[in-house]
Amino acid sequence: MLTFRKIVDFYIHSSIHVGVAVFCLVQLSVPQWTSYSFLVFFGTVVGYNFLKYSEWFFTHQFFRIQYIGILVVTLISALGFSLLFLQQDATVQLNLILAFGLVVLYPFVRKIGWLKPFYVSFVVSYITLFVPLKSDVDVIVLFVQRFLLLSSVMIPFEILDSSKDAVAMKTLPHCFGIARTKQIGYGLVGLF
């Protein structure tokens, strides 16, 4: 049981679950198993780990034994992302560079707490829907639907994290209260 717990902890801390979730969203848009789906998986793991562990990446603390597995997963994902990125056509590469710019802006957007879930939903929708289906006529409708779905799914996590987040962050629960934040989530689901 202890081994299973260690595996689950590693799976969660290395952000593989986030990569799998975003991979699945790409598969909803483009059902065939394309290199783009795996590119997004690897890119998500790298980007999420970089944002999550950025303060440790630049210190000697990160090279402690408990972080080595996460570092290895991140480096393998970076290699996979790089190789698959080079296989994409120029339009996809340009769109991914734009998405990378949006990810780099995330730490600044995070300071505007109430905007964070909507920003993340926009970036994930852009990567999982707009880039692979940019020429599809229904892409705008699908994009709005995915944005509403992702925003509503993030609301419970915003509420859960509200006890840990500083009030100065002004997250949705801090700005509107938990009951009103739930109503916002219900409204987003209704619009979806």
Task: State what each model feature region is.
Residues 20-40, 80-94, 128-144, 192:
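Helix-coil boundary and interhelical linker segments in multi-pass alpha-helical membrane proteins
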